[in-house]
Amino acid sequence: IPDIIHNFNLSDLAMAGFIPTSFFLAYAIMSIPAGLLIDRFGEKPILFGGFLMPFIGTILFACMHTYPMLLASSFIIGLGMAMLQTVLNPLQRTVGGEENYAFIAELAQFMFGIASFLSPLVYTYLIRELDPATYTAGKGFFIDLLADITPREMPWVSLYWVFTILLLVMLIAVGVSRFPKIELKEDEKSGSKDSYLALFKQKYVWLFFLGIFCYVSTEQGTSIFMSTFLEQYHGVNPQTDGAQAVSYFWGLMTAGCLVGMILLKLIDSKRLLQISGILTIILLLSALFGSKEVSMLAFPAVGFSISMMYSIVFSLALNSASQHHGSFAGILCSAIVGGAGGPMIVSTLADATSLRTGMLFILVFVGYITFIGFWARPLINNKTVRLKDLFKQR
């Protein structure tokens, strides 16, 4: 965000907030249509399309470096991500079993966390290697190639070329792979318009929709603005220590997913959600009002404390429904538009008052997520084992 504000001369944080807004707005638009497309064309074509859209989006901005193109690129990438999310969520529940869905979803979140942890590190590496003040030819074929095709004053654009290459590899892999025919139960298919209308009449659907919205608002509101907060209040360099803090945020989220996979086999998911919420509130308050040292520790630690929230809320939601699980998954995926709403709320409040005040609103999102742990009544609880059973002799 700091680099984007600087390179495009954006006047306020709200302008920068339009970037995640354009990305996550695509979720609200594409999630339900993606489910209908899966029913018509099958999983593999939509999976391929889910990688094709981000490929188009990344290569567009990599070639045309303007703020409007960045917004368009983010939107196109978001469309593809919505397609991928809608394809994969019901399949996870089918392959892993209903009682293990929270665990499988946590495993998927773990893989997401690894990629998110590595991304800021790659960003820092590319910024350092392509810095126009220090770059000299001969650093290696790949770095020299990126230097030739990336604007000297915008070395961070090189990250888009890296994404383009990775997405091309995924397109080839999906294209040549033999995708098995997966028979979903009738209630796991995306369903007709009537199934969506029936779900929209259910109170719990809207309550869980709001839960996913609040989670993504929390995740994005924290990760997007923590570097800017550390720069404004503690003088932290956003390209080095700030980027490292963001990397640690995602790295600790990855570690939290590993811990979560174990805890979900031992403790009821609702109790874990309550504990995670209370811990997150404590960490956010420490990050926003603590010293530089405390903030540098507390912000990344939020990644650990929220790591189980998404998979738990999603599994509680689907396991609270007796039918139309595929359609419900599409509705829940559209709630990822919270990644647009959360940063916009934070940035708007920050421009009107201060960034600290804006980020305090994240506590409202966390409070609601914590509340879900008290009122949720799933039809199927996550499968747990007792510790003493693990040590019984065979």
Regions found by a protein language model. Give the residues of each.
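Helix-to-loop junctions at the C-terminal end of transmembrane segments
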Residues: I29-E43, G256-D268, A350
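Conserved MFS/SLC helix-loop-helix module at the cytosolic interface between two early adjacent transmembrane helices
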Residues: I29-P68
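Intracellular juxtamembrane helix-capping segments at the cytosolic ends
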Residues: M83-G97, S307-S322
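Extracytoplasmic gate region of multi-pass secondary transporters
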Residues: S119-R128, A198-S247
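C-terminal membrane-cytosol helix-exit motif in multi-pass small-molecule transporters
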Residues: Y123-P132, F141, L145, P151, ...
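C-terminal transmembrane helical hairpin of 12-TM major facilitator-type secondary transporters
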Residues: I267-V313
